[in-house]
UniProtKB/Swiss-Prot annotation:
It catalyses: L-arginyl-[protein] + NAD(+) = N(omega)-(ADP-D-ribosyl)-L-arginyl-[protein] + nicotinamide + H(+); NAD(+) + H2O = ADP-D-ribose + nicotinamide + H(+). It comes from Mus musculus. GO terms for cellular component: external side of plasma membrane; extrinsic component of plasma membrane; membrane. InterPro entries: ADP-ribosyltransferase_ARG (IPR050999), ART (IPR000768). A lipid is attached at residue 260 (GPI-anchor amidated serine). It is a lipid-anchor; GPI-anchor. Transmembrane segments: none annotated. This is T-cell ecto-ADP-ribosyltransferase 2. The lineage of its organism: Eukaryota, Metazoa, Chordata, Craniata, Vertebrata. The gene is Art2b.
Length: 289
């Protein structure tokens, strides 16, 4: 009986550690991210991207399936959707696909690009989504809200960026809903000038989604915990030069790129706890046989 009680509390404690309640994510400049803005190579990329898309399809079955579904949805809504000159079907399909089931895996790949650049199978998708956001941007700024189920912290020094495409909402209520937020997470209150309203393209228009590109940098960061949960205010946004530019165009420009793996200490701790949990529970189970 004693061993069962011990096993229960041990499992509970380790689970809390593994789920991230004790290991928050640090908000920084996302140094591993793929942040290409395709400056001065849009015309060339428009020619090359269809080929890259087919190559990605061959390596990424989920992307292929989600793209095909998004193509159908885009054809159904394009005639009732307003979009600027230069915005074509590939851009529309990319936006629709992003609001479906691709966002989590895609953003993980974008955020950790430098750790495994050869395994990045979203080359064309990243281009089309980036261009869609750039074309839709009306040069205006908005106050938006982004809820997360994981805790973020800020060191108090330096500018920050998300390093991935980040969904937000014009409505605080949406960001605080259980679909996006938990009390162990973070509410971001963001002044964005590069984010664009994609309500017309979204699979969930009631969310009033504003999509923020990962290269928007925030120079003023304020964190507080006055409402019983973590809040981070991001202000003074700016579009700064990216680490990558025209990377898949054959005339790549990079800024101080180091492709060595820069894994975080927090990831190592989480992995260790997962392994420890499994081993200890296994030993306790065997001891009761």
């Amino acid at each position: 009986m004693t061993s069962k009680i011990f096993k229960f509390f041990l499992t509970w404690w380790l689970t809390q550690q593994v789920t991230g309640l004790a290991v928050p994510f640090m908000l920084d400049m996302a140094p591993n991210a793929f942040d290409d803005q395709y400056e001065s190579c849009v015309e060339d990329m428009e020619k090359k991207a269809p080929q890259l898309l087919q190559e990605d399809f061959n390596m990424n079955e989920e992307l292929k399936l989600e793209w095909e579904k998004a193509e159908i949805n885009w054809k159904e809504i394009k005639n009732s959707t307003s979009y600027p000159a230069g915005f074509h079907d590939f851009h529309g399909t990319a936006l629709v696909a992003y609001t479906g089931n691709l966002a989590i895996d895609f953003n993980r790949a974008v955020r950790d690009f430098k750790k495994s650049p050869d395994n990045f199978h979203y080359k064309a998708f990243h281009y089309y989504l980036t261009r869609a956001v750039q074309l839709l941007n009306d040069q205006g700024c908005s106050l938006v809200y982004r809820g997360t189920k994981v805790m973020f912290e800020y060191t108090g020094k330096g500018s920050v960026r998300f390093g991935q495409f980040s969904s937000s909402s014009l409505t605080k209520r949406v960001a605080l809903s259980s679909n996006f937020f938990s009390n162990h997470g973070t509410l971001f209150i963001i002044r964005t000038c590069l984010g664009v309203n994609i309500k017309e393209f979204s699979s969930f228009p009631r969310e009033e989604e504003v999509l923020i590109p990962g290269y928007e940098v925030y120079h003023k960061v304020t964190a507080q915990n006055d409402n019983g949960y973590n809040e981070i205010f991001l202000d003074s946004p700016e579009r700064k030069k990216s680490n990558f530019n025209c990377f898949y165009n054959g005339s790549a420009q990079t800024v101080n790129i180091d492709f060595s793996i820069s894994g975080s200490r927090e990831s190592c701790v989480s992995l260790f706890l997962v392994v420890l949990l499994g081993l200890l529970v296994q030993q306790l189970t065997l001891a009761e046989l």
